[in-house]
């Protein structure tokens, strides 16, 4: 029976009011170690994993524990949650927060690189809408079907088709240039899921999209956001897409999300959760994680998550729970409003 070892880095981002410029280097909370080159594929799970409940040593108390002070300001909660996740879950985490209405911004290790996994599908969609707006490649009915499946259900086949049709890695170069994503780079191997970005760049991308930095027009932006708001509870591969933001913010009625997951990169699970919060998309949240996993017999393997169903894998579930618990510890009332204020 194969096993895997995994480690997790978490990035969280929240945004709020049109046409915001994200400050850099402010309110840094935690430094995250640099990531290693990606060696895996996205949005699927390991072969021959142990039965549910096996393998991962789980903290005797739920995450987050009482060591995360719910009444403290967000900056203090971030610091406590990062430390607690590392100690209790074997998880490294980073976060960036922006309120588009006020321009308030907070970050922790938001400049650390992370593989996008399925977050690269956002860049594919942005390129499709860009070319449609220019009239260079009008969207066909089939294109719209692929966009819907790719964004709502994280369909890898749809992403593969559009990625190849658009020229592969050129998509990342073009989108990064138009949106000012200074730390976002194309995949080293030409595979979209190995694109690298940062928490800060993901926040910048969403802010630029909502502010129409690329000249897409209101209708295209509304369609793009509509797909994110229609995200399915499970991906097309059966993987639970509610981790992180959706389950972590149960009090938010209007949430648009794009999720990503894959294993193994540097012997780690990668999970990414990003979202637009509120009817007016005032807030944008993004969370990325890397979590080390060790099964009880310590046997190591590197599952190909592009071809194997890991929806019931205990290590993946543990990492998802870490993501959700982290978000809950930052927003214990289950909503993002007044995030800079004590939430006791």
List PLM regions with ranges.
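N-terminal export and membrane-targeting signals
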Residues: 1-12, 143
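C-terminal motif of bacterial Sec signal peptides marking the signal peptidase cleavage site
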Residues: 16-19
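Short, conserved catalytic-motif segment at the N-terminal edge
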Residues: 86-113
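Active-site SXXK
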Residues: 103, 113-137, 150, 285
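Short, well-structured active-site flanking segments
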Residues: 130-149, 168-169, 217-220
């Amino acid at each position: 029976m194969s096993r895997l070892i995994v480690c997790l880095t978490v990035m969280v981002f929240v945004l709020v009011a049109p046409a915001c410029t994200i400050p850099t280097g402010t309110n840094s909370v935690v430094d995250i170690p640099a990531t290693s080159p990606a060696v895996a594929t996205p949005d699927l799970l390991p072969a021959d994993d142990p039965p549910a409940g096996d393998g991962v040593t789980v903290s005797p108390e739920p995450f987050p524990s009482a060591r995360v002070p719910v009444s403290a300001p967000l900056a203090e909660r971030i610091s406590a949650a990062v430390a607690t996740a590392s100690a209790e879950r074997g998880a490294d985490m980073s976060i960036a927060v922006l309120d588009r209405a006020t321009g308030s911004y907070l970050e922790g290790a938001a400049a650390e690189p992370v593989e996008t996994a399925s977050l690269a599908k956002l860049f594919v969609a942005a390129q499709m809408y860009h070319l449609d707006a220019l009239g260079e490649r009008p969207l066909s009915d089939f294109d719209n079907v692929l966009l819907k499946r790719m964004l709502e259900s994280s369909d890898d086949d749809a992403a593969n088709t559009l990625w190849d049709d658009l020229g592969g890695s050129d998509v990342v170069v073009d989108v990064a240039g138009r949106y000012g994503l200074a730390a976002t780079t194309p995949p080293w191997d030409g595979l979209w899921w190995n694109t690298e970005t940062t928490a800060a760049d993901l926040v910048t991308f969403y802010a630029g999209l909502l502010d129409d930095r690329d000249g897409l027009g209101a209708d295209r932006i509304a369609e793009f956001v509509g797909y994110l708001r229609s995200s399915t509870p499970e991906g097309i591969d059966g993987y639970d897409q509610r981790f992180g933001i959706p389950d972590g913010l149960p009090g938010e009625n209007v949430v648009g999300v794009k999720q990503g997951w894959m294993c193994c990169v540097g012997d780690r699970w990668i999970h990414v959760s990003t979202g637009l919060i509120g009817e007016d998309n005032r807030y944008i949240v993004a969370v990325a994680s890397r979590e080390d996993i060790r099964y009880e017999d310590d046997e190591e393997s590197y599952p190909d998550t592009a071809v194997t169903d890991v929806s019931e894998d205990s290590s993946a579930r543990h990492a998802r729970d870490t993501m959700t618990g982290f978000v809950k510890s930052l927003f214990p009332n289950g909503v993002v409003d007044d995030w800079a204020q004590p939430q006791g």
